[in-house]
């Protein structure tokens, strides 16, 4: 099956090396980092789990059963990939202060471990996630030297901050449904479904804008009318572009692209027609976005991994790095290798569909 992101431009050209990603769950390890400390008291039981080959929503549902509460009483800061070993916090609303016996739950699911239990005065929400720490192993690498050369470039320049294929659902189904909803003016009270489709719509258009900037040679430099980001503030780029580029190289500002909304683009000059063309190319997605009154936002077009390092052992390369919340490790890997398809065999004892892949953001 063709990757939904395959038409998008590569910063350094399509990789020549091939390798397997997530050949084993332990080849993709994720450690969640919250943006604050837990209080140790409050109405919410905080459970830090390590899961192998399971997705977040499945574990949350089973944890809710173990605690004797409805699924809506369990929340998280971010979804984690199924095909991985991941650590994250789940919060369970248990206002009476009780701590359930998890022994039966753990015996039923040896793929799930409980690492820590404490309490907090607020439930977990998606905005609570500061970022993730990754340990990613590329196996059966066809050309180790080529990957190492690219790693040097990635460490210096970063990679396109694409939303990963996980954002668009299995086989791109979320994106297909987003287009259908926009085309047919579908109205639904299913907030979760609507959120998934809106997210897919905005993410797709953002990716197209970033790809176009690479094609036009303005990924790593400002153009007239850009919007710069700096510490959650936005600035109109005008005046001497060379000075803006100096600030970009110094890491003081970032080039941004549109997360489309129902209001007008804030860009001008050269940047406005570049972005507007990609919005106009997706009338069904824009109909969905406008119909739901989404407000325009911005996202940096470049992704730079923090604390990036790597080790080589024969035909395996192990990467260690951290990413801020909302960024995709698979977007970094995409610049390094062409993935060799991996056939996975999972226990079919309970529903695979409900346990399929999720994003690392």
UniProtKB/Swiss-Prot annotation:
One of its GO terms (cellular component) is cytosol. Residues 158-303 form the TRUD domain. It comes from the Bacteria. The keyword Cytoplasm does not apply. InterPro entries: PsdUridine_synth_cat_dom_sf, PsdUridine_synth_TruD, PsdUridine_synth_TruD_CS, PsdUridine_synth_TruD_insert, TruD_catalytic, TruD_insert_sf, TruD_pseudoU_synthase. GO terms for biological process: pseudouridine synthesis; tRNA pseudouridine synthesis. It catalyses: uridine(13) in tRNA = pseudouridine(13) in tRNA. Disulfide bonds: none annotated. The keyword tRNA processing applies. It holds the Pfam family TruD. Responsible for synthesis of pseudouridine from uracil-13 in transfer RNAs. PANTHER family: TRNA PSEUDOURIDINE SYNTHASE D. This is tRNA pseudouridine synthase D. The gene is truD.
């Amino acid at each position: 099956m063709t990757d939904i992101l395959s038409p998008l431009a590569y910063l350094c050209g399509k990789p020549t090396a091939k390798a397997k990603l997530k050949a084993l769950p332990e080849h993709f390890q994720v450690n969640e980092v919250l943006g604050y400390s837990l209080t140790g008291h409050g109405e919410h039981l905080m459970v830090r789990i390590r899961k192998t080959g399971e997705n977040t929503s499945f574990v949350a549902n089973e944890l809710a059963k173990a605690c004797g509460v409805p699924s809506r009483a369990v929340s998280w800061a971010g979804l984690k990939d199924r095909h991985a070993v991941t650590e994250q916090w789940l919060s369970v609303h248990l206002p009476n202060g009780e701590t359930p016996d998890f022994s039966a739950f753990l015996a039923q699911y040896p793929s799930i471990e409980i690492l820590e239990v404490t309490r907090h005065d607020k439930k977990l929400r998606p905005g609570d996630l500061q970022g993730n720490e990754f340990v990613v192993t590329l196996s059966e690498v066809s050309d180790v030297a080529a990957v190492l050369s690219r790693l040097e470039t990635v460490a210096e320049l970063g990679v396109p901050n694409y939303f990963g294929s996980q954002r668009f659902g299995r086989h791109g189904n979320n994106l297909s449904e987003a287009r259908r909803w926009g085309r047919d003016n579908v109205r639904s009270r299913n907030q979760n479904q609507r959120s998934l489709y809106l997210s897919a719509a905005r993410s797709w258009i953002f990716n197209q804008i970033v790809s176009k900037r690479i094609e036009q040679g303005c990924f790593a430099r400002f153009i007239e009318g850009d919007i710069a980001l700096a510490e959650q503030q936005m600035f109109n780029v005008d005046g001497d572009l060379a000075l803006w580029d100096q600030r970009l190289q110094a890491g003081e500002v970032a080039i941004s692209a549109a997360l489309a909304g129902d209001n007008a683009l804030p860009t001008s000059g050269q940047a406005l027609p570049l972005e507007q063309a990609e919005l106009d190319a997706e009338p069904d997605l824009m109909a969905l976005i406008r119909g739901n009154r989404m407000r325009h936002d911005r996202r940096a077009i470049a992704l730079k991994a923090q604390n990036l390092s790597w080790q080589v052992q024969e035909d395996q390369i192990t990467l260690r790095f951290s990413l801020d919340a909302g960024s995709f490790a698979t977007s970094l890997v995409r610049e390094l290798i062409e993935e060799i398809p991996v056939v996975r065999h999972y226990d079919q004892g309970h529903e695979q569909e409900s346990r399929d892949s999720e994003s690392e953001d």
